[in-house]
Amino acid sequence: MARLQLAGSRRLVPLPRRAPRLAPLLLPLLLALPDGARADCPCKVPALCRPMTHRPDFEVFVFNVGHKTWKYYDWSQITTVVLFLKYDPELMCHAHAKGARVVLKGDVPVKDIINATFRASWIAQQVKLAKTQYMDGINLDIEQDVAHSSPEYYALTALVKETTDSFHHEIKGSQ
């Protein structure tokens, strides 16, 4: 083992000799990961962690509310799964293997989105969550009443546009 002596110190710090030899081997492996796939991809096939980019002619949404009922879906019909509860990496891998998108459910109190700073922060959090979980976008599911021409009305319009722009910029092919 090589030793490093710090100037003005009598302490010796052992340095492993094999580490420099591993770095050139690891770099090509990291570079070989498909776009959108990272080393922490939960799928057996890392390519399944890439965002789905195809655009179907029509959409068939499934709103997943948990458990493992997704194992019994007719995957030949489904284009998008919206997760209403806890993230399930097994579901994400399976859906991507079947060519279906998996998206977040986006819900936020309408009174809060009037504040542009809050709105931007909420959108950034959703994008980060979607990217961390290898998801393909977001389904805004806001079911609160909004009066026509109210501040909430215009804020909701801004939320939809800003969310769409952010997701499309950050996740290729996202919804």
From Swiss-Prot:
Main function: Involved in the degradation of asparagine-linked glycoproteins. Hydrolyze of N-acetyl-beta-D-glucosamine (1-4)N-acetylglucosamine chitobiose core from the reducing end of the bond, it requires prior cleavage by glycosylasparaginase.
Localization per Swiss-Prot or TrEMBL: Lysosome
Catalytic residues in the record: E143
Gene Ontology, cellular component aspect: lysosome
Keyword Glycoprotein: yes
Highest classification ranks of the organism: Eukaryota, Metazoa, Chordata, Craniata, Vertebrata
Protein name: Di-N-acetylchitobiase
Residues bearing glycans: N115
